[in-house]
Amino acid sequence: MISPVPSIPRSAHRQRPEATPYVDLTRPEWSALRDKTPLPLTAEEVEKLRGLGDVIDLDEVRDIYLPLSRLLNLYVGATDGLRGALNTFLGEQGSQSGTPFVIGVAGSVAVGKSTVARLLQALLSRWPEHPRVELVTTDGFLLPTRELEARGLMSRKGFPESYDRRALTRFVADIKAGKAEVTAPVYSHLIYDIVPDQRLVVRRPDILIVEGLNVLQPALPGKDGRTRVGLADYFDFSVYVDARTEDIERWYLNRFRKLRATAFQNPSSYFRKYTQVSEEEALDYARTTWRTINKPNLVENVAPTRGRATLVLRKGPDHKVQRLSLRKL
Protein backbone atom coordinates (compact mmCIF):
# COMPACT_ATOMS: atom_id res chain seq x y z
CA MET A 1 0.00 0.00 0.00
CA ILE A 2 1.38 3.38 -0.97
CA SER A 3 1.46 5.85 1.87
CA PRO A 4 -0.16 9.19 1.11
CA VAL A 5 2.23 12.08 0.57
CA PRO A 6 2.05 14.24 3.67
CA SER A 7 0.78 17.72 3.01
CA ILE A 8 3.31 20.49 3.39
CA PRO A 9 2.18 23.49 5.38
CA ARG A 10 1.81 26.59 3.21
CA SER A 11 4.41 28.40 5.31
CA ALA A 12 6.96 25.69 4.48
CA HIS A 13 6.72 26.36 0.75
CA ARG A 14 9.24 28.83 -0.62
CA GLN A 15 7.39 32.07 -1.12
CA ARG A 16 7.95 33.68 -4.48
CA PRO A 17 8.93 37.32 -4.07
CA GLU A 18 6.20 39.73 -5.02
CA ALA A 19 6.89 41.32 -8.38
CA THR A 20 7.62 45.05 -8.21
CA PRO A 21 8.93 47.58 -10.73
CA TYR A 22 12.04 48.03 -8.55
CA VAL A 23 15.16 46.07 -7.70
CA ASP A 24 15.57 46.36 -3.91
CA LEU A 25 19.13 46.36 -2.59
CA THR A 26 20.69 46.42 0.84
CA ARG A 27 23.56 48.77 1.59
CA PRO A 28 26.23 46.01 1.26
CA GLU A 29 24.69 44.78 -2.02
CA TRP A 30 24.69 48.28 -3.46
CA SER A 31 28.18 49.11 -2.20
CA ALA A 32 29.60 46.07 -4.01
CA LEU A 33 28.41 47.56 -7.32
CA ARG A 34 30.98 50.35 -7.26
CA ASP A 35 33.40 47.79 -8.75
CA LYS A 36 36.84 49.43 -8.87
CA THR A 37 35.64 53.00 -9.22
CA PRO A 38 38.27 55.20 -7.51
CA LEU A 39 37.25 57.70 -4.84
CA PRO A 40 38.05 61.14 -6.32
CA LEU A 41 37.12 63.25 -3.27
CA THR A 42 39.09 63.98 -0.11
CA ALA A 43 37.63 64.21 3.40
CA GLU A 44 38.04 68.00 3.22
CA GLU A 45 36.06 68.18 -0.04
CA VAL A 46 33.26 66.06 1.43
CA GLU A 47 33.17 68.33 4.48
CA LYS A 48 32.62 71.37 2.23
CA LEU A 49 29.83 69.62 0.32
CA ARG A 50 28.02 68.39 3.40
CA GLY A 51 24.88 70.21 4.50
CA LEU A 52 24.37 71.52 8.03
CA GLY A 53 23.35 68.62 10.26
CA ASP A 54 24.20 65.98 7.66
CA VAL A 55 26.72 63.30 8.63
CA ILE A 56 27.97 62.14 5.24
CA ASP A 57 31.58 60.99 5.42
CA LEU A 58 34.04 59.26 3.09
CA ASP A 59 32.59 55.83 3.90
CA GLU A 60 29.11 57.02 2.89
CA VAL A 61 30.49 58.50 -0.32
CA ARG A 62 32.39 55.30 -1.09
CA ASP A 63 29.50 52.93 -0.27
CA ILE A 64 26.54 54.87 -1.69
CA TYR A 65 27.51 57.71 -4.01
CA LEU A 66 30.43 56.14 -5.89
CA PRO A 67 28.21 53.27 -7.12
CA LEU A 68 25.56 55.86 -8.02
CA SER A 69 28.06 57.93 -10.01
CA ARG A 70 29.12 54.76 -11.84
CA LEU A 71 25.49 53.92 -12.63
CA LEU A 72 24.82 57.44 -13.88
CA ASN A 73 27.95 57.31 -16.03
CA LEU A 74 26.55 54.14 -17.62
CA TYR A 75 23.18 55.84 -18.18
CA VAL A 76 24.84 58.84 -19.83
CA GLY A 77 26.86 56.54 -22.10
CA ALA A 78 23.78 54.52 -23.02
CA THR A 79 21.89 57.72 -23.83
CA ASP A 80 24.73 58.83 -26.10
CA GLY A 81 24.57 55.45 -27.84
CA LEU A 82 20.82 55.76 -28.30
CA ARG A 83 21.28 59.25 -29.71
CA GLY A 84 23.75 57.86 -32.26
CA ALA A 85 21.25 55.18 -33.25
CA LEU A 86 18.56 57.84 -33.68
CA ASN A 87 20.85 59.95 -35.86
CA THR A 88 21.55 56.89 -38.01
CA PHE A 89 17.82 56.27 -38.37
CA LEU A 90 17.11 59.90 -39.28
CA GLY A 91 19.90 60.00 -41.85
CA GLU A 92 20.47 63.50 -43.23
CA GLN A 93 17.96 64.91 -40.75
CA GLY A 94 19.74 63.28 -37.82
CA SER A 95 22.27 65.96 -36.97
CA GLN A 96 21.71 66.00 -33.20
CA SER A 97 24.82 67.18 -31.40
CA GLY A 98 23.41 66.00 -28.10
CA THR A 99 21.56 67.70 -25.26
CA PRO A 100 22.35 67.69 -21.53
CA PHE A 101 21.53 64.62 -19.45
CA VAL A 102 19.10 65.87 -16.78
CA ILE A 103 18.90 64.42 -13.25
CA GLY A 104 16.20 65.31 -10.72
CA VAL A 105 16.82 65.06 -6.95
CA ALA A 106 13.73 65.22 -4.71
CA GLY A 107 12.87 64.78 -1.04
CA SER A 108 11.67 66.54 2.08
CA VAL A 109 13.07 69.59 3.79
CA ALA A 110 16.08 68.56 5.96
CA VAL A 111 16.36 65.05 4.47
CA GLY A 112 19.73 65.84 2.89
CA LYS A 113 18.79 66.13 -0.79
CA SER A 114 20.94 69.25 -1.28
CA THR A 115 24.01 67.36 -0.04
CA VAL A 116 23.16 64.46 -2.36
CA ALA A 117 22.89 66.86 -5.31
CA ARG A 118 26.21 68.56 -4.51
CA LEU A 119 27.97 65.20 -4.09
CA LEU A 120 26.64 63.99 -7.43
CA GLN A 121 27.82 67.18 -9.10
CA ALA A 122 31.32 66.75 -7.64
CA LEU A 123 31.56 63.04 -8.46
CA LEU A 124 30.07 63.17 -11.96
CA SER A 125 32.33 66.07 -12.98
CA ARG A 126 35.35 63.83 -12.27
CA TRP A 127 34.35 61.43 -15.08
CA PRO A 128 36.18 62.43 -18.30
CA GLU A 129 33.09 61.75 -20.44
CA HIS A 130 31.06 64.57 -18.82
CA PRO A 131 33.18 67.12 -16.95
CA ARG A 132 30.69 69.99 -17.16
CA VAL A 133 28.01 69.38 -14.53
CA GLU A 134 25.67 72.18 -13.42
CA LEU A 135 23.42 72.20 -10.35
CA VAL A 136 20.24 74.29 -10.14
CA THR A 137 17.88 74.33 -7.16
CA THR A 138 14.19 75.07 -7.55
CA ASP A 139 14.42 77.72 -4.80
CA GLY A 140 15.20 80.25 -7.52
CA PHE A 141 11.74 79.64 -8.97
CA LEU A 142 9.88 80.42 -5.76
CA LEU A 143 7.61 83.41 -6.20
CA PRO A 144 9.15 86.58 -4.70
CA THR A 145 8.09 87.34 -1.12
CA ARG A 146 6.08 90.34 -2.29
CA GLU A 147 4.10 88.11 -4.66
CA LEU A 148 3.61 85.41 -2.02
CA GLU A 149 2.27 87.99 0.42
CA ALA A 150 -0.07 89.45 -2.20
CA ARG A 151 -1.49 85.99 -2.89
CA GLY A 152 -1.68 85.00 0.79
CA LEU A 153 0.84 82.19 0.23
CA MET A 154 3.61 82.98 2.75
CA SER A 155 2.36 80.17 4.99
CA ARG A 156 2.45 77.87 1.94
CA LYS A 157 6.04 78.61 0.94
CA GLY A 158 7.51 75.38 -0.43
CA PHE A 159 4.13 74.01 -1.53
CA PRO A 160 3.74 73.53 -5.30
CA GLU A 161 1.62 76.66 -5.70
CA SER A 162 4.38 78.87 -4.26
CA TYR A 163 6.60 78.26 -7.32
CA ASP A 164 6.54 79.69 -10.81
CA ARG A 165 6.17 76.19 -12.19
CA ARG A 166 5.74 77.33 -15.77
CA ALA A 167 9.06 79.23 -15.68
CA LEU A 168 10.82 76.27 -14.05
CA THR A 169 9.54 73.82 -16.64
CA ARG A 170 10.43 76.22 -19.46
CA PHE A 171 13.95 76.59 -18.04
CA VAL A 172 14.60 72.83 -18.13
CA ALA A 173 12.86 72.49 -21.50
CA ASP A 174 15.22 75.11 -22.94
CA ILE A 175 18.22 73.26 -21.48
CA LYS A 176 16.93 70.02 -22.99
CA ALA A 177 16.36 71.74 -26.32
CA GLY A 178 20.07 72.48 -26.47
CA LYS A 179 19.92 76.27 -26.17
CA ALA A 180 23.37 77.81 -25.90
CA GLU A 181 22.55 79.88 -22.82
CA VAL A 182 19.67 79.68 -20.34
CA THR A 183 19.24 81.78 -17.19
CA ALA A 184 17.44 81.23 -13.89
CA PRO A 185 16.58 83.47 -10.91
CA VAL A 186 18.80 83.32 -7.82
CA TYR A 187 17.40 82.70 -4.32
CA SER A 188 19.06 83.80 -1.07
CA HIS A 189 18.44 81.88 2.15
CA LEU A 190 19.91 84.87 3.98
CA ILE A 191 17.17 87.29 2.91
CA TYR A 192 14.62 84.48 2.37
CA ASP A 193 13.75 85.86 -1.06
CA ILE A 194 14.70 86.07 -4.73
CA VAL A 195 17.77 88.26 -5.28
CA PRO A 196 16.81 91.23 -7.50
CA ASP A 197 18.72 91.74 -10.76
CA GLN A 198 20.75 88.55 -10.38
CA ARG A 199 20.59 85.52 -12.70
CA LEU A 200 22.27 82.13 -12.81
CA VAL A 201 23.61 81.41 -16.31
CA VAL A 202 23.75 77.83 -17.61
CA ARG A 203 25.66 77.20 -20.84
CA ARG A 204 25.11 73.77 -22.39
CA PRO A 205 26.42 71.50 -19.62
CA ASP A 206 27.01 67.80 -20.14
CA ILE A 207 24.78 67.08 -17.15
CA LEU A 208 22.21 69.25 -15.35
CA ILE A 209 21.09 68.37 -11.81
CA VAL A 210 17.78 69.89 -10.70
CA GLU A 211 17.22 69.68 -6.93
CA GLY A 212 14.06 70.57 -5.02
CA LEU A 213 11.08 69.49 -2.97
CA ASN A 214 8.61 69.11 -5.80
CA VAL A 215 10.68 68.25 -8.86
CA LEU A 216 8.83 64.94 -9.36
CA GLN A 217 5.37 66.53 -9.22
CA PRO A 218 3.22 65.71 -12.25
CA ALA A 219 1.96 68.66 -14.26
CA LEU A 220 -1.44 70.08 -13.41
CA PRO A 221 -4.07 70.00 -16.17
CA GLY A 222 -4.55 73.28 -18.01
CA LYS A 223 -7.70 75.37 -17.74
CA ASP A 224 -8.96 73.57 -20.82
CA GLY A 225 -8.52 70.23 -19.03
CA ARG A 226 -5.67 69.10 -21.25
CA THR A 227 -2.64 67.38 -19.75
CA ARG A 228 0.51 69.49 -19.78
CA VAL A 229 4.15 68.52 -19.98
CA GLY A 230 5.67 68.55 -16.49
CA LEU A 231 9.17 69.20 -15.20
CA ALA A 232 9.85 65.51 -14.51
CA ASP A 233 9.03 64.66 -18.13
CA TYR A 234 12.42 66.14 -19.05
CA PHE A 235 14.41 64.05 -16.56
CA ASP A 236 16.65 61.24 -17.80
CA PHE A 237 17.13 59.96 -14.24
CA SER A 238 15.69 60.92 -10.86
CA VAL A 239 16.58 60.30 -7.21
CA TYR A 240 14.22 60.48 -4.23
CA VAL A 241 15.84 60.79 -0.79
CA ASP A 242 13.56 59.03 1.71
CA ALA A 243 13.44 58.66 5.50
CA ARG A 244 10.92 58.18 8.30
CA THR A 245 8.93 61.33 9.04
CA GLU A 246 9.98 61.28 12.72
CA ASP A 247 13.64 61.23 11.73
CA ILE A 248 13.23 64.10 9.28
CA GLU A 249 11.51 66.19 11.95
CA ARG A 250 14.39 65.57 14.36
CA TRP A 251 16.94 66.51 11.67
CA TYR A 252 14.95 69.65 10.87
CA LEU A 253 14.94 70.81 14.51
CA ASN A 254 18.65 70.01 14.92
CA ARG A 255 19.44 71.99 11.79
CA PHE A 256 17.37 74.92 13.07
CA ARG A 257 19.37 74.92 16.31
CA LYS A 258 22.64 75.04 14.38
CA LEU A 259 21.41 77.76 12.03
CA ARG A 260 20.29 79.82 15.03
CA ALA A 261 23.85 79.65 16.35
CA THR A 262 25.46 80.45 12.99
CA ALA A 263 23.75 81.87 9.87
CA PHE A 264 20.86 83.47 11.77
CA GLN A 265 23.37 85.62 13.65
CA ASN A 266 24.06 87.61 10.49
CA PRO A 267 22.46 91.07 10.86
CA SER A 268 21.03 90.72 7.33
CA SER A 269 19.38 87.36 8.06
CA TYR A 270 15.60 87.19 7.69
CA PHE A 271 15.62 84.86 10.71
CA ARG A 272 17.80 86.99 13.00
CA LYS A 273 14.78 87.65 15.25
CA TYR A 274 15.00 84.03 16.43
CA THR A 275 18.43 84.67 17.91
CA GLN A 276 16.96 87.40 20.11
CA VAL A 277 14.52 85.15 21.97
CA SER A 278 15.15 82.12 24.15
CA GLU A 279 16.12 78.84 22.51
CA GLU A 280 12.84 77.27 23.64
CA GLU A 281 10.80 80.09 22.06
CA ALA A 282 12.76 79.74 18.84
CA LEU A 283 12.26 75.98 18.82
CA ASP A 284 8.54 76.45 19.41
CA TYR A 285 8.48 78.44 16.17
CA ALA A 286 10.43 75.69 14.38
CA ARG A 287 8.06 72.98 15.68
CA THR A 288 5.06 75.02 14.55
CA THR A 289 6.61 75.50 11.12
CA TRP A 290 7.22 71.77 10.85
CA ARG A 291 3.71 70.87 12.00
CA THR A 292 1.83 73.41 9.87
CA ILE A 293 4.00 73.71 6.74
CA ASN A 294 6.80 71.20 6.22
CA LYS A 295 5.08 68.02 7.41
CA PRO A 296 1.80 68.66 5.54
CA ASN A 297 3.77 69.47 2.38
CA LEU A 298 5.77 66.25 2.79
CA VAL A 299 2.66 64.13 3.32
CA GLU A 300 0.45 65.78 0.70
CA ASN A 301 2.89 66.63 -2.08
CA VAL A 302 6.45 65.37 -1.70
CA ALA A 303 6.17 61.77 -0.46
CA PRO A 304 3.49 60.79 -3.02
CA THR A 305 6.04 61.46 -5.80
CA ARG A 306 8.49 58.86 -4.45
CA GLY A 307 7.14 56.18 -6.80
CA ARG A 308 8.04 58.34 -9.81
CA ALA A 309 11.78 58.23 -9.04
CA THR A 310 14.31 56.07 -10.86
CA LEU A 311 16.18 55.47 -7.60
CA VAL A 312 14.99 55.75 -3.99
CA LEU A 313 17.62 56.19 -1.25
CA ARG A 314 16.21 55.16 2.14
CA LYS A 315 18.03 56.68 5.09
CA GLY A 316 18.12 55.38 8.64
CA PRO A 317 17.92 57.46 11.84
CA ASP A 318 21.66 58.28 11.58
CA HIS A 319 21.28 59.91 8.12
CA LYS A 320 23.06 56.95 6.48
CA VAL A 321 21.46 55.18 3.52
CA GLN A 322 20.34 51.67 4.51
CA ARG A 323 18.37 50.43 1.50
CA LEU A 324 17.94 51.41 -2.14
CA SER A 325 15.28 50.73 -4.75
CA LEU A 326 16.24 51.01 -8.42
CA ARG A 327 13.54 51.05 -11.08
CA LYS A 328 13.79 48.22 -13.59
CA LEU A 329 14.18 48.95 -17.30
UniProtKB/Swiss-Prot annotation:
It catalyses: (R)-pantothenate + ATP = (R)-4'-phosphopantothenate + ADP + H(+). It is found in: Cytoplasm. ATP binds at residues 107-114. Pathway: Cofactor biosynthesis; coenzyme A biosynthesis; CoA from (R)-pantothenate: step 1/5. Disulfide bonds: none annotated. Pfam families: PRK. GO terms for cellular component: cytoplasm. Keywords: ATP-binding, Coenzyme A biosynthesis, Cytoplasm, Kinase, Nucleotide-binding, Transferase. Transmembrane segments: none annotated. CDD domains: PanK (cd02025). Residues 1-21 are annotated as: Disordered. Its EC number is 2.7.1.33. InterPro entries: P-loop_NTPase, PanK, PRK/URK. GO terms for molecular function: ATP binding; pantothenate kinase activity. One of its GO terms (biological process) is coenzyme A biosynthetic process. Belongs to the prokaryotic pantothenate kinase family. This is Pantothenate kinase. It comes from Streptomyces coelicolor (strain ATCC BAA-471 / A3(2) / M145). The gene is coaA.
